[in-house]
A protein has these predicted regions:
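ATP-dependent adenylation/nucleotidyltransferase module used to activate substrates
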Residues: 1-156
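Immediate flanking context of iron-sulfur cluster ligation sites
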Residues: 154-175
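Iron-sulfur (Fe-S) cluster-binding segments and ferredoxin-like electron-carrier domains
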Residues: 172-197
Length: 197
């Protein structure tokens, strides 16, 4: 918003058969508070193509072991998100996409890595016949650094209260799933670093 202007920002959310809707409700509320346009794109068939714990509520959430990905990995999800964002962007004249992936923490999902982002930028540019720029400002930040960025922007409390991470869809966080642990540990680490300085 600061870099491009409120009227140049469209927040996108995706419905892909995820087990809860709380993240969509949080996104709607954040977009309204920030006074930016918000569009929801439906990709429901993704849940039919991939059996994982984010789209199958009968599966318990498990961390990956021995180099495997956690069962929360949805193959190709970020590729689809970026493809659909670029298609929508083309209709409104937008060539810059911003995505909040980070490769520094947790699972090392392949579609959160920098080489994937660079590859998608090239692929989308070729597919649309024009230069597409993908920004991933959190790419190399761990969770503590992301909390620090929120604090530097004067939005730490707001982000803590309004953003959503829990895989189980618990508003305040379940304090059990890997996403909650990562979020809580990152905030705890950031606050500890603040006390040391």
């Amino acid at each position: 918003i600061h870099d491009y202007g409120r009227d140049q920002v469209v927040a996108l959310s995706f419905v892909y058969g995820q087990r809860h809707s709380i993240e969509l409700e949080a996104a709607k509320k954040m977009a309204a508070t920030l006074r930016v346009s918000h569009k929801i794109i439906f990709l429901n068939t993704l849940a039919e193509l991939s059996d994982n714990a984010l789209t199958n509520s009968e599966k318990s959430i498990q961390s990956g072991e021995n180099g495997s990905y956690p069962n929360t990995f949805v193959p190709g999800r970020n590729a689809l998100f970026l493809l659909y964002a670029a298609i929508y962007g083309d209709t409104i004249g937008a060539r810059r996409l911003v995505i909040g992936v980070s490769e520094a923490d947790f699972s090392g999902y392949p579609d959160c890595r920098a080489d994937f982002i660079f590859s998608m930028e090239e692929t989308l540019s070729l597919a649309l016949g024009k230069k597409i720029i993908i920004e991933a400002p959190l790419q190399y930040l761990n969770k503590a650094e992301i909390w620090g960025l929120a604090d530097a922007l004067g939005a730490l409390d707001w982000v803590e209260e309004n953003s959503h991470t829990c895989y189980l869809g618990v508003k305040e966080g379940c304090h059990e799933c890997p996403a909650c642990h990562l979020r809580e540990e990152g905030l705890k680490r950031y606050r500890a670093l603040q006390q040391e300085s």
